[in-house]
Amino acid sequence: MIYVCVPAHNESRTIGVLLWKVRKVLGEFDRPYRVVVHEDGSTDDTAEVLARYSRSLPLTVLRSDEQLGYAASVDRLLRYVVNDAPYPKRDCAVVLQGDFTEDPQDLVGLVKVLEGGADIVAGCATDSSGPVPRSVRLIGRLSRLALGKVLDDSPVSDPLNGFRAYRVIVLKKAFRDRPESEPLVSSEGWAANLELLGALAPHARRIGEAPLDRRYEFRARPSRLRAWRTLRALARLRGESWWSELDVGAA
């Protein structure tokens, strides 16, 4: 089972077309799947759009009355998968943004690498990706200064990118004996993606990568990325030693 996990806050303009594309891609891929969306206290029509699509694809919607934020949304989604997945050694969860900047077509590449033996598969943007906003380029350059060896020693080339596939057994081990009051991740945004990889990588035997396209031009709302807030969050992770004793193979 492929669980496509989508954190969504005020994504009514893109969540419908995203779900339609996921259904098309995974229907052709011919693997069982379920889309799990955390509707994070949206104030637009996101909930109404999700209700319409619940009749046309396997969809589970988790809801919070107030906005919890990206990290808490991802935590809830992954906990749901751990509790629902019938075959944790075979099933996987893929985290996909609700703003359509990540192409659902790339789900196939991630899952194929995982089926080849990897326990975590990280998306790696290709040179063919669309134009990158100036703020994203700036943070990408400055993040190396903010993170130092945490970035240099990472087991994947882009640990700030959250488009990844995780074998459920890895999630299960990470969440073991960890109540909901103790989330895996406390940062937000790009820092949350890095922190999540740091929490899960020690439980993986093999970590791989798959190419993907980033399509910032498809976002139908203003970017929520704030350069200095993101850099401050990344700088707080500079002293982490996630990779110091990591012993995983490449996939």
Segment roles from a protein language model:
Residues 26-31, 54-58, 86:
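Short helix-capping segments at alpha-helix termini
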Residues 1-2, 20, 28, 53, ...:
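Hydrophobic helical membrane-anchoring modules
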Residues 11-15, 42, 103:
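Donor nucleotide-sugar binding loop of glycosyltransferases
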Residues 11-26:
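Short, well-formed alpha-helical segments that are part of the catalytic scaffolds
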Residues 31-41, 62-64:
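Short beta-strand/loop segment that forms part of the nucleotide-sugar
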Residues 39-48, 100:
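A conserved acidic beta->alpha catalytic loop
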Residues 60-81, 90-92, 103-183, 217-225:
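Acceptor/aglycone-binding surface of glycosyltransferases and processive sugar-polymer synthases
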